[in-house]
Regions:
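Amphipathic alpha-helical interaction motifs in eukaryotic regulatory proteins
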Residues: 110-117, 172, 177, 228, ...
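Short interface patches used for recognition in eukaryotic signaling and trafficking proteins
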Residues: 93-102, 155-162, 250-256, 353, ...
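Residues that flank catalytic or metal-binding motifs in active/ligand-binding sites
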Residues: 91, 118-120, 130-132, 155, ...
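Domain-level representation of secreted and single-pass membrane ectodomains enriched
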Residues: 3-8, 278-469
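Metzincin-family zinc-dependent endopeptidase catalytic domain
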Residues: 66-87, 97-234, 364, 370
């Protein structure tokens, strides 16, 4: 049978996609390119490994202050810092702009700060000079920040919004670091939510996925956090292999999709800065994971901020069944013979985009899939591009060997009549796209189940269809 998703699908991201410009440093001849991906998909190669002053940059965009060493700092690498001395006093953050920041970028930075002010008790004040302050600048390479308030003593601490970083959600992300947030994928409890495909990255990059020691103040992991990197972070093969996989395949396309501050981002920062401490009703108990809104200094009671899927004065009402995340608009869990296809097949119409089919065989069986049609946006045909012949625009990840790692297909890679089987009891198909790049007819396939001792075809068939890059 096929278990359908809820009919009502609301995109978690209020923007469907953005174009992130990147340059791959491994190839000096590579020209800056645009590629369409959802949310925070920072290609970690766009940043240097150290600042021009020689300060180390870890996890892609976190600057370690002089005198600190990565291993020494790991004791406080949760999602939110635990050392109150690195929090901004009373939630007041002073800042100014370096002369390299033009008016358009200033407007974006101010907008990003307002996002944090709207959802927390933080206040950003522009000052030419202060004991501690943030200096936004655009003359450095890459997007990066230090974590929390650094005791700079009138010298200021830089937040770099360099070339290719002028995207609001990237700026929100870097400000997140400056107010004390680490990356979501660095949380100590991350293994309960994501799987790291170590074999898809160079050994030298393993340290980029070091974990912290403790969980961040009881706030659950969030795939849609503005602090979560995309699924290909630090991969050796962009648009071919993921490094981060959701334990639940239905959540895969949510990873790094955050276009704005999520509920759990705001909840964590409000806890870090004790934003409800002065609420007249701070003894009020919000239910079902809700929290009191930040106190605004007006002697008015604070209200409960309810997480997605709940409502009411005290968040007492919850949807049945309750889901924090919305599921992909198409796909489902398949446990018996079925025929699957993308919505509106053989055409593709917005706004439906991502799909996920999690096909599971019973004990003693394996999954068999016959592809009747496979038609998506072609592989990139710019032979001067680093991403030449890769699934640059949209991709269909097919996992036949295990739950967390597969190969990416697109165009008409899979001819009609192609038959593939799973190595074990699971066969997963995940379509990652958006309405701006959808092309082709989509996908249509027959699903059936065979004895586990039958011939295994997955590696012989699907892998052989991948082009040599």
């Amino acid at each position: 049978m096929i278990t359908p998703f809820p009919v009502a699908f609301v995109l978690l991201c209020f923007l469907n996609s953005f174009l992130l410009e990147t340059e791959v440093k491994a190839d000096e001849s590579t020209q800056p390119e645009f590629f369409p991906l959802k949310g925070l998909q920072i290609l970690t190669e766009m940043n240097p490994t150290q600042t021009e002053d020689g300060w180390e940059i870890v996890e892609g965009d976190i600057v370690l202050p002089p005198g600190s060493r990565r291993k020494q700092d790991k004791h406080q690498e949760t999602k939110g810092i635990i050392n109150i001395l690195t929090l901004w006093t009373n939630g007041k953050v002073s800042y100014n702009f370096h002369s390299s920041v033009d008016d358009d970028l200033k407007e974006m930075i101010v907008g990003a700060m307002k996002e944090w002010e709207t959802h927390t008790c933080l206040k950003f004040n522009e000052k030419a000079l202060d004991f501690n302050y943030i200096r936004f600048r655009a003359d450095k390479e890459g997007c990066w920040s230090m974590i929390g308030r650094i005791n700079s003593i009138f010298a200021g601490q830089d937040v770099s919004i360099g070339d290719r970083c002028n995207r609001t959600n990237i700026i929100v992300h870097e400000i997140g670091h400056a107010i004390g947030l680490y990356h979501e994928q660095s949380r100590n409890d991350r293994d309960g939510y994501i799987h790291i495909n170590w074999h898809n990255m160079p050994v030298a990059r393993y340290s980029q996925f070091d974990r912290g020691i403790e969980s961040p103040r009881g706030v659950e992991y969030d795939y849609t956090s503005v602090m979560q990197y995309g699924p290909m972070a630090f991969t050796e093969k962009y648009f071919q292999k993921n490094t981060i996989a959701a334990l639940n395949p239905f959540h895969q396309t949510l990873i790094g999709s955050g276009m704005k501050i999520s509920f759990r981002d705001s909840k964590l920062v409000n806890k870090m800065y004790s934003c409800s401490a002065f609420c007249p009703n701070n003894a009020s108990q919000c239910q079902n994971g809700g929290f009191l809104s930040p106190y605004r200094g007006d002697n008015q009671p604070c209200h409960c901020v309810c997480q997605p899927g709940s409502s009411g004065e005290f968040c007492e009402n919850i949807n049945d069944p309750y889901e924090y995340y919305e599921f992909p608009p198409c796909g489902g869990n398949i446990t018996s013979d079925a025929e699957i296809e993308t919505p509106n097949y053989p055409t593709r119409k917005p706004p439906v985009d991502n799909c996920a089919w999690w096909i599971q065989a019973e004990e003693g069986k394996r999954v068999k899939v016959e592809f009747m049609d496979f038609s998506f946006h072609p592989r990139l045909d710019k032979n001067d591009s680093f991403f030449y012949r890769r699934c640059y625009h949209e991709r269909v990840e097919i996992r036949t060997r295990n739950r967390y790692d597969g190969d990416m297909f697109c165009g008409e890679d899979i001819p009609p009549g192609t038959v593939a089987t799973s190595a074990g009891r699971e066969f997963i198909i995940i379509i990652d796209t958006n309405e701006q790049v959808m092309e082709g007819r989509g996908l249509k396939a027959k699903v059936s189940f065979i004895d586990e001792k039958a011939e295994q075809l997955s590696d012989l068939v699907l892998t052989s269809l991948l082009p040599t890059l």
